[in-house]
Amino acid sequence: MKALDLGVLFMNRRNWIAGSITGLVGLGHANSKASSAPLGLDIIDCHTHFYDPMRPEGIPWPEKGTSLYRTVLPKDLRALKQFRPVTGTVIVEASSHLEDNQWLLDIAKDDPFIVGIVGRLEPATKEFGNQVKRFAANPLFRGIRVSSDLVADLLEKGTLGDLKLLADSDLALDVNGGPETPAILAKLAKKLPSLRIVLNHIGNVRITSEGPPLAWREGIQKAALNKNIFCKVSALVEGATRDGKRPPKDLAFYRPYLNVVWNAFGYERVIYGSNWPVSELAAAYGTLQQIVMEYAFEKGGNTMERFCSLNAKQAYKWVERPGRRG
């Protein structure tokens, strides 16, 4: 494994295990193949949701009465048992309330662990331009997330001005949707080559022992031809959850799908994200981390560093903050 320009130090298997003991306790990861990864590995979780139903405004999601309906803040993520310590996060919107964008920015103000926020604004509304100007004034506001249905609608109507405004404002666009999403984004990327686009959750493909469906595989390949599209490897365990049963923990089960993503996007445009706390409905945080990091480690070179932080730096231009790593 070659050295990085970040000056990351490398260590042998014994030192890695010793240095990771806090995160490994109780998770059964001490014999991980990824035990030779760098000591100073910077891990930016680029897909977390934070919210507080106790606020006077309440929250539109998650629904009351569910296990997710509770206060979830960055300190709760940091307290989790992790395969390797997360060193920062990019928060993704969890609310349709406009002022919840500001609430997240207010939380981030005094917490250097938060290196970026992907908010929620509504393109194709008369307020959109002023809202982008307002929130983009804060350097921690790194983009917005929309649905693939909205993107498809804007493409059909040929009204892409608001999305171009994002590119002109140096903001990224996260897109969430089903397995048809990669093909939709391939069309968008050609129309707006200066817009940095991030496919969420590898397109929410259903992960089964039967292997990747052809339409999704072809969509991923089409999307990856556009250098302004990145793929977030997030919500992986949710994609394998069926009928209330916990998904497999073995990398082998997910490998065919990860192969499609990596073969298409290469090591330069894949991004780590968890989708926590939603992911906890399917698997423990340490488990989902191990699956994808074992895979990235096998690729050798500086793939781990690219996957865990550097690619996200290109996609989001997340903000380095004093005190982030203690």
Regions found by a protein language model. Give the residues of each.
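Mid-domain alpha/beta scaffold segments of enzyme catalytic cores
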Residues: S35-S169, V175, P179, A223, ...
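Catalytic pocket-lining loop regions of alpha/beta-barrel enzymes
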Residues: D153-I271, Q314, E320-R325
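Short aromatic-enriched loop/helix-cap "lid" or pocket-rim segments at secondary-structure transitions
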Residues: M54-I59, Q102, N130-Q131, E210-P212, ...
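Short, small-residue-enriched loops and turns at beta-alpha junctions
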Residues: S96-H97, A124-T125, L150-L154, V205-T208, ...
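Residue-level preference for long, well-ordered alpha-helices that form the structural scaffold
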Residues: T66-R70, D100, L155, P212, ...
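Mid-to-C-terminal alpha-helical segments outside catalytic/metal-binding sites
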Residues: A3-L6, R13-G28, S35-C46, S67-G88, ...
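Active-site metal-binding loops of divalent metal-dependent hydrolases
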Residues: T48, A94, I202, N275-W276
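Short helix-capping segments at alpha-helix termini
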Residues: D110-F113, P139, K191-R196, N226-K227, ...
